């Protein structure tokens, strides 16, 4: 039984290139989706962040220029001091949906649209896919 995945990537991202090479090496079918041209929607991000059981911060590209120039860390810190966890997640999802460059990549989604992984750590992808 073969499953196809969607990989949300930036074309120049070296981590995305490593992830795609890993998928190719393991003959795993995928569709490439530009995280810039077709950034994740609020609905998608709400679903994926909930399914992941990860901190919302894991979904941010913390090394990106957009994250740093917009002072997103400070926004998240402020939200976490003043809002409930659910409100923080909702605010963060809204922010992530505004710009694909804010999102950590790659994002790996299964054929049914469910979250599989964020970022590329070979051991995590191996555990999830092989």
Residue locations for each model-derived region?
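Thiol/selenol-based redox catalytic cores and closely related redox-interacting motifs
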Residues: 37-130
